[in-house]
């Protein structure tokens, strides 16, 4: 496995740059680095294939369209969608969720009906529903969390009513790494009028996705969290649901016929892709799917479990560290605080050691409120990370704690763990 990771790491040029040879990158829940195959696919498109799609009858235009639609086919296969017409390209997960809130919500949600989310959601799966609820005079409800930060499914049962029209939940938390039981939740909705949207931004790069098996109506994710380019994402939608949706934006390509007074619409997915799309980035996303398939998600998941287990073991040796984590190594995101030290101070000092990780509320302020803190530090892993990365992170963390606590009489050594939950 170590040889495999080293071979994979070689394909990521950022780690071999003169400026970043000592980089320890542990902010993968935010965005992943890009392999040569993805970068080369984008460059090759602009060098050899660049033309608009779905318009030109000339050879270059046909090749561009083939590359664009070929990426759609790859993505449909990657998530086991029924066919590629259920794949809509967006700017990312955020736009995909906003698309559903507008194109589905404005047409299907009525005054007094209900939207159900949870307290662990990223703001991108909260704010669009707030805006929709305000527009439609609907009711927004949230599933609370248990003491171990999981969805309170008993409370969910009581929150589901005959007025619930959409349930929107993360597949995996970007703060705790918890993977929600989406398939079980979808079964709860089978005899209701509610549709299910899944935010798959965190799970897409390491958990095999079968949208039919999950039982979801919508599945949204971003390219940049799965080793692909920024500025491109995907919304999967079931065909019968797509047919209930009005266009999200107006413009070229999404129309069938246009007069001065009215227009008719193209078929999905093009109905929801107005204007010139982000063609090169879509091609790059197709290359990212190929990259993941070549390695195998089972191998990636196994590696991430090993890294998470090692990190948890090392961090649990230390006092002063409080983990917001269940201890399950399949949850490959670890949020934590250090007693008496603000997460921002940790990040600033550890940056001097070229340790890159995230601090803040992680676009999940309701979850921070549940924790009783304003911010946490967070490390998250990708296929190119190694145990050496974690060792360097731990050593830098120890050194930083000693420096920041050195001015006081508090003990700076990180010894056996025994502290209460800390509120910053």
Residue ranges of predicted features:
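Pyridoxal 5′-phosphate
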Residues: 1-424
């Amino acid at each position: 496995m170590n040889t495999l990771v080293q071979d994979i790491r070689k394909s990521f040029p950022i780690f071999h740059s003169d400026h970043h040879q000592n980089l320890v990158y542990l902010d993968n829940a935010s965005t992943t680095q890009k392999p040569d195959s993805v970068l080369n696919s984008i460059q090759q498109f602009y060098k050899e294939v660049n033309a608009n799609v779905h318009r030109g009858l000339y050879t270059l235009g046909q090749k561009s369209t083939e590359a664009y639609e070929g990426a759609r086919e790859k993505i449909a296969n990657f998530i086991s969608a029924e066919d590629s017409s259920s794949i809509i390209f967006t700017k990312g997960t955020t736009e995909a969720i906003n698309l559903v809130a507008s194109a589905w919500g404005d047409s299907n949600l009525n005054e007094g009906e209900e939207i159900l989310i949870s307290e662990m959601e990223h703001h991108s799966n909260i704010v669009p529903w707030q805006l929709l609820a305000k527009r439609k005079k609907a009711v927004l409800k949230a599933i609370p969390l248990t003491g171990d930060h999981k969805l309170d499914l008993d409370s969910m049962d009581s929150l589901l009513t005959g007025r619930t029209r959409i349930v929107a939940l993360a597949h995996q938390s970007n703060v705790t790494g918890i993977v929600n039981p989406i398939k079980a939740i979808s079964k709860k909705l089978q005899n209701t009028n509610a549709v299910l949207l899944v935010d798959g931004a965190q799970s897409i790069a390491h958990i095999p996705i079968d949208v039919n098996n999950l039982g979801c109506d919508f599945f949204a994710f971003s390219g940049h969290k799965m080793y692909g380019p920024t500025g491109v994402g995907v919304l999967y939608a079931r065909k019968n649901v797509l047919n209930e949706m009005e266009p999200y934006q107006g413009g070229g390509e999404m129309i069938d016929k246009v007069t001065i007074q009215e227009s008719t619409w193209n078929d999905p997915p093009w109905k929801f892709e107005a204007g010139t799309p982000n063609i090169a980035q879509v091609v790059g996303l197709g290359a990212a799917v190929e990259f993941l398939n070549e390695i195998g998600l089972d191998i990636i998941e196994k590696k991430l479990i090993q890294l998470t287990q090692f990190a948890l073991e090392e961090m649990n040796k230390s006092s002063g560290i409080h983990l917001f984590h269940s201890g399950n190594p399949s949850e490959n995101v670890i949020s934590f605080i250090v007693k008496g030290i603000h997460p921002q101070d940790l990040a600033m000092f550890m940056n001097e050691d070229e340790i890159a990780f995230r601090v803040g509320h992680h676009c999940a302020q309701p979850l921070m409120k549940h924790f009783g803190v304003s911010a946490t530090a967070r490390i998250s892993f990708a296929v190119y990370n190694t145990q050496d990365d974690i060792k360097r992170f731990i050593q830098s963390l120890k050194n930083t704690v000693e420096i920041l606590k050195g001015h006081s009489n508090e003990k700076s050594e990180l010894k056996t763990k025994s502290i209460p939950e800390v509120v910053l």
